[in-house]
Amino acid sequence: ISDTLHKHLPDDFQSAAQILVDALGPEPATDSLSGFDGFIVMPQCLFISRYGLDDFVTSINALYEMTKRFTAEGDIRTFIEKYPSKTMTFLHTLTQDESPFARRLASEGTRPRLPLFSRLPEFQRDPLPVIKILEKLKSDPNLMVRRSVANNLNDIAKDNPDIVVETLERWQKSAPSKEMDWIIAHALRSLLKEGHPSALNLMGYNPDVKISVSEINLSNDAPAIGEEIEFSFTVRSREDEPSKIMVDYLIYFMKANGKQTPKVFKAAKKNIAP
């Protein structure tokens, strides 16, 4: 669609961008992304990032208007790569914008490992510029924005786990709230699956808790495709005091190359007696 737009819009990029902006509908009445109505703006965002890279001001202003109707999270990355300083300055201003969609762009667009889009290796190496933006959004009143903050930190944790844990420890002390507790849990989800000791400790789990697992039973040790399997096991604490534990289990899935890869699932979160 963006290529077709290019065929029919004026060759002058500023004129073309203005036509696209003028054609945008009103900003959403709600403050969350839902449904598919906004997807019509997706090819327009792509047009800007594909054909407007040499006109920073026009492109950034157009993406700002478009992201308030959909999201320019993938397209802003093109400008982060070519104009890192100017684009990050712009994103910092968005953290104070009235539109939650614009504020979300500041976080979502800087995710080092944003799904469906190319990674930002400079932020994988050094996430501090991103964290400076997240600092301004950590107590945002909008859940959509806070979710983006947590997802961004989850991305960062895959390359810089200790920085994320240290950041969340600081936030927990400086801005304690139920909303912050939610951000911490959501941001640490990958590290918790890995059993990262500091992440477990931040969530209130003792990574060195002494437990035993026994009486493992399978209803079928060789299930065929389409069949169900039930399993059970017993977890006992060997501590002298009650312990908070989180129990996960792994299922290994066969990949096309013949190798198996594990996926972690949650079984239970319990307080168990000695």
For the regions a language model picked out, list residue spans one by one:
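Active-site capping/gating regions of soluble enzymes
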Residues: 217-219, 230-231
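Non-catalytic, glycine-rich low-complexity segments
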Residues: 198-217
